[in-house]
Amino acid sequence: MATTPLPNALSAYRLLLRATRIAFQGDFTTLHAARAEARKHFDQNRRLGVDTPKHIQHAVETAEILRTNVVQGVRVEGSGEAGKGEERYELRIHEHIERGDNDTIKTAGNKRIKAAVGKTCSQS
């Protein structure tokens, strides 16, 4: 079983910065905060140590999560039906977002779920 070699610290840092750019595109405040946090953690561990590969692996995994699992939403003004006070959000789903294939739904089979009669999900 072959394992992929870990990148060096600079490559991991660049990977993390690219992931923040993808995940937080259009949200300057969050993008700046995420990059500042990444820099802070890399600066704290500037010297090589025994746990350096662990920190690099953590940065690579964090970049992967940011790139594939973080979706941002923006509240859309004036949305919803008049008088109901519903809020609507527009999600920014980009090409890197991981999309599930609903295997859990397919394998659920004929399991019965108890639900309150007359209630919808938004009323709970």
Swiss-Prot record:
The organism's taxonomic lineage, starting at the top: Eukaryota, Fungi, Dikarya, Ascomycota, Pezizomycotina
Function noted in UniProt: Assembly factor required for Rieske Fe-S protein RIP1 incorporation into the cytochrome b-c1 (CIII) complex. Functions as a chaperone, binding to this subunit within the mitochondrial matrix and stabilizing it prior to its translocation and insertion into the late CIII dimeric intermediate within the mitochondrial inner membrane. Modulates the mitochondrial matrix zinc pool.
Superkingdom: Eukaryota
Record-level GO BP terms: mitochondrial respiratory chain complex III assembly
Main location: mitochondrion
Assembly behavior: Interacts with RIP1.
Name of the gene encoding the protein in the UniProt record: MZM1
CDD domains, alphabetized: Complex1_LYR_LYRM7
Name the UniProt record assigns to this protein: Mitochondrial zinc maintenance protein 1, mitochondrial
A cellular component term, taken from the record's GO annotations: mitochondrial matrix
Keyword field: Chaperone, Mitochondrion, Transit peptide
Species, as recorded: Paracoccidioides lutzii (strain ATCC MYA-826 / Pb01) (Paracoccidioides brasiliensis)
UniProt family annotation: Belongs to the complex I LYR family. MZM1 subfamily.
